[in-house]
Amino acid sequence: MAPKDIMTNSHAKSILNTMNSLRKSQTLCDVTLRVNLKDFPAHRIVLAACSDYFCAMFTNELSEKGKPYVDIQGLTSSTMEILLDFVYTETVHVTVENVQELLPAACLLQLKGVKQACCDFLESQLDPSNCLGIRDFAETHNCLELMQAAEVYSQKHFPEVVQHEEFMLLHQEEVEKLIHCDEIQINSEEPVFEAVINWVKHNRHEREKSLPQLLQYVRMPLLTPRYITDVIDAEPLIRCSLQCRDLVDEAKKFHLRPELRSQMQGPRTRVRLGANEVLLVIGGFGSQQSPIDIVEKYDPKTQEWSVLPSITRKRRYVATVSLGDRVYVIGGYDGRSRLSSVECLDYTSEEDGVWYSVAPMNVRRGLAGATTLGDMIYVSGGFDGSRRHTSMERYDPNIDQWSMLGDMQTAREGAGLVVANGVIYCLGGYDGLNILSSVERYDPHTGHWSHVTPMATKRSGAGVSLLNDHIYVVGGFDGTAHLSSVEAYNIRTDSWTTMTSMTTPRCYVGATVLRGRLYAIAGYDGNSLLNSVECYDPLIDSWAVVTSMATQRCDAGVCVLREK
C-alpha cells in the first residue's frame, strides 16, 4: 500500500486553543506587553508568527529583544486586549464604537487580519452621511481598497452625499476633487451646481471668494436653458461676481449658438460618465424571417456587446421599458397572434437573472408604445390582429395590476411614446389607412389627451426618445420611403426642428438615450435587416457609427438599464 499524506483540519485550531489556554493561565509566557500600566502576558513565538512588528522586535537587535517587559505606546489597554484575542483565536470583535481605535492599532502592530476586518466592517457601514469621512480615515491609514470603495460610494450617491455635514466641512480642494470627477452619478448637473452654492453659503464670509474657482468644475453648458435662466441667473452669489457671470454667459452661448459648439468642446461640455448604464436590445424580427428571443447588452464603457438570457417567448413588434432594476417586455407578435403577455427580468451586473411572467395587459397589442412615469408603466395604441387601438393602460408593479386610462383621439400602431415634464407624448404611427404626423399629449392629472404641433414628416415605426428637453424622432417609414431623417420637438415652444440625418435609413428602429447621447439601434433600411448602431452627439450635432450587434433585427424592444 502506497504511503499517503493526511492533513487534519482541526490541528491548527487545536494548537491555537491550547496556546490561548496557556496564555490565560500565564503558563510558558516569556514576555509581558505593558499598555497604559496594564500587563498582558504572552508568548514571543505566537506574537512573532502573527505580526511582522513583533517578529522584527524579537528577532532583530532591538532593545526589546531580550526584555521580559515591552511597553507598547499609541493604543489603549482595551484595544490591546482585542488584538491579543485575535492573535490567539483568529477572531476579532469589530464595532462602531471600537473601529476607529482598532484599525490604527492594527496598522501599528502590523496585524493584517484585523486591519482587513476593520476595513470590511467600515465598507459595510458606508452611507451618504459618513462616506467622505471614511474615505479620509482610510487614506490616513493607507487602506487603499477601503478608500477606493468609499470614493466610489460618494460618486454613486453624490446627490445624497452633498446634503450631509461631512460635505459642508470639506476644504475647497476636496470639493474641487469631488465635483471635478467624471464618474459622479447624476442625471443632470443641477445637483453639482446646488452643492457648490450650498457649500459656499455654509460659511459665506470665508468661502464666497472660492465660488468662481469651484464653478469652473460645474458643467453649466449641460444644464437646460430654463434652469440657467430661472435658477442660476436668479442666484445672488452669481449676480455679484463678474467671473461667475462669465461662466454663465458661456453656458448661454452654448445653447444660443449651436453652430459654435464644436469650437467650445472642453471639460465643461463633456458629459459625465455617471452610472454604469447599459443598453438592452430584446427580441424583434430576425434574419430567419421570424420573431426572435435574443437579448443583447451594450456597455458604452467597453463598447462591446454581450448576450443575456433569452426571453421566454419569441416576440417582434415588442415594447420594452426599464423601471428600477427591472426590465419589462410587453406585448408583441409571436408569429401566430398578438400578445397581451408581459415578461420581467430582475437584473444586476453580477447576475444576469431569469425572465418571469407578470400580469398580462387587458388588451393584446403589437407595435404599441410604452414608457414610464413615476413608478408606473404606460402602454398605448397598438394592433391586436383586427384593429388599431386608441386605448391606454397603466401597470402598477407594486400590486401587479393593469388598469385602463383615457383613450387617445386617434388609433395608432407603430407610434412612439415618451414622457417629458410629467406629460406623455404619443407621436406618429399608422391608423390603418394613413401614416401619421400628428402628435398627442396625455396629462395624467386631468386624464385627457390633446393635440400639439404635428411633426414635419409623417412616420410610423420611428424611434422616439427624450434628450435635453427635446423629443427626438428618428427614421421610420412615411408610406413611400424608409427614412434617415431626424426631427426634434421643443416642449417649451411647441415647435419642430429638422436635425442632422442618420447615416442609414432605419424603419422599426429602436431609439434611446445613454450618457447624454441618442442611440439608433438596428431596424430595416428597405432592403435588409440591420445590426448596425449609430450614436448622435447633440453637442456637435453629428452621428457616428458605433459597434454593431451580433444579431440583425428590426421591431426590437430597446431600453437603458443602470447596473449596480
Swiss-Prot record:
It comes from the Eukaryota. CDD domains: BACK_KLHL12, BTB_POZ_KLHL12_C3IP1_DKIR. One of its GO terms (molecular function) is ubiquitin-like ligase-substrate adaptor activity. Pfam families: BACK, BTB, Kelch_1, Kelch_KLHDC2_KLHL20_DRC7. Pathway: Protein modification; protein ubiquitination. The keyword Nucleotidyltransferase does not apply. Kelch repeats lie at residues 278-325, 327-375, 376-422, 423-469, 471-516, 518-563. One of its GO terms (biological process) is neural crest formation. Residues 131-232 form the BACK domain. It is found in: Cytoplasmic vesicle, COPII-coated vesicle. Residues 29-96 form the BTB domain. GO terms for cellular component: COPII vesicle coat; COPII-coated ER to Golgi transport vesicle; Cul3-RING ubiquitin ligase complex; cytoplasm. Keywords: Cytoplasmic vesicle, Developmental protein, ER-Golgi transport, Kelch repeat, Repeat, Transport, Ubl conjugation pathway, Wnt signaling pathway. Component of the BCR(KLHL12) E3 ubiquitin ligase complex. PANTHER family: KELCH-LIKE PROTEIN 32, LD33804P. Substrate-specific adapter of a BCR (BTB-CUL3-RBX1) E3 ubiquitin ligase complex that acts as a negative regulator of Wnt signaling pathway and ER-Golgi transport. The BCR(KLHL12) complex is involved in ER-Golgi transport by regulating the size of COPII coats, thereby playing a key role in collagen export, which is required for embryonic stem (ES) cells division. This is Kelch-like protein 12. It comes from Xenopus laevis. The lineage of its organism: Eukaryota, Metazoa, Chordata, Craniata, Vertebrata. The gene is klhl12.
